[in-house]
Amino acid sequence: MTNANSPRHWTVRHFSQANPFGPGCDNVPALLRRLADSIEALGPVEIQNVVIESEMTEHGPWQSGTVYFHLPDDAATD
């Protein structure tokens, strides 16, 4: 029996991508398309979270994103 006060643990996979540095690095729609293409390339996955961040540069905010996800077989190994 599991103690109700015990924290649950699991493994989550992730990848990060950014727009190319320079003019256009602040283009959020381009970043979202890039992330969506990468998610589709993974095949069937369960998305846990998507985080968008920005870092100020001389070209404006440099956008990046991190996708946290699970593969279908991950539940069997946790």
Indicate residue ranges for each PLM-predicted region:
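Short, charge-rich amphipathic interface segments used for partner binding and complex assembly
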Residues: 34-78
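N-terminal acidic leader/helix
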Residues: 2-41
